[in-house]
Each structure stands twice: as C-alpha cells, then as structure tokens.
C-alpha cells in the first residue's frame, strides 16, 4: 500500500460538498539521505508545501542531523502556517522547481530546488510572483543577508535547494 502525501476528504455543509485537503507528511529519516544538501532539500520542500516536520530518526541513528530539524528560520514557516506553491505546475518545466509563497507579515519565501543530478541555474524576476521593486534577500539555511534586488539568479547543485526570504 503506497502512502499518500496528500489525502482528499469531503465535508458536507449546507448540502454542498467542499474539498478539503489534509497534509499527511512522510516521516523524515535524514540518516537515509546521502548529503547535507539532500537533507536540507527534503526539509525545505516539506515546509514550503505547508507541512510539518516529522522526525523519524532514532537516537542511535540521528548523528549530527539534529541541526537540520532545528533551523529556527525554516521552522518559522510552519509556525506562520505558510503554504507555498510551485511557480508552474508542469513538472517538465524547470520553473516547477521554484516554489514561493507569502508569509502573514507580507514577506515572501522563495525556494529554488534541483531534482537533477547536475547543477542547474535558476532565475526569478520578482514581478513573476507579484512583487514590484527590490526586496531584501536572506538565505534561510546559511542565515545570511544577501543584499537587495528585484531578481535572483542562482546556481543550485545536484539535489540541492536555496531558500530565501524576501522582505521590504
């Protein structure tokens, strides 16, 4: 039986059916991933999709992976009830590997992912996601401010991600 990441259920109200979605996360065992980049990516995608982080590592297998589960800047997405979405839904288009969403305070979070086995360039004009003008950029994994701009061009390594917060 395959585990469904997203289950649909219906709620009848006033004789109308409304679709509701329940995020059912996979339990994450970071010790099963080969690189730190893959560990960051799996946690990032879960949080960008609006899901919680569920730890399945055991005390004897977690090793030094606890740091990935404790990134306060990334966990703030879950605390804020952030839910992002892919720029495009066509999985054959590389823009589908760019995710974005808006936090309750108006900041945007953008995730650049790379599912491929070789480095890829990703670019985004902020106007593509409804942002006019420049924003301050902060890398949420490196905990570094990266200046102010109205576009981003990044090289993302194989199975890596780059998650940034854009603020006024």
Locate predicted features.
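Short, solvent-exposed S/T- and G/P-enriched segments that are highly enriched in secreted/extracellular
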Residues: 148-152
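Active-site-proximal substrate-binding groove within the catalytic cores of carbohydrate-active enzymes
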Residues: 1-143, 153-166
């Amino acid at each position: 039986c395959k585990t469904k990441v997203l289950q649909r259920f219906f709620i009848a109200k006033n004789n109308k059916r409304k679709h509701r979605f329940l995020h059912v996360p996979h339990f994450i065992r970071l010790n099963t991933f080969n690189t730190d980049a893959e560990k960051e990516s799996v946690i990032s995608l879960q949080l960008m999709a609006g899901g919680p982080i569920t730890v399945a590592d055991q005390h004897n297998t977690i090793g030094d992976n606890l740091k990935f589960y404790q990134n306060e800047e990334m966990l703030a997405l879950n605390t804020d009830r952030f839910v992002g979405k892919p720029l495009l839904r066509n999985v054959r288009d590389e823009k589908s590997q760019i995710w974005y969403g808006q936090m309750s305070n108006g900041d945007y979070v953008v995730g650049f992912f790379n599912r491929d086995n070789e480095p890829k360039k990703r670019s985004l004009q902020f106007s593509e996601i409804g942002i006019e003008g420049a924003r301050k950029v902060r890398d949420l994994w490196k905990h570094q401010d990266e200046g102010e701009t109205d576009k981003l061009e990044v090289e993302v390594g194989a199975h890596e991600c780059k998650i940034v917060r854009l603020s006024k």
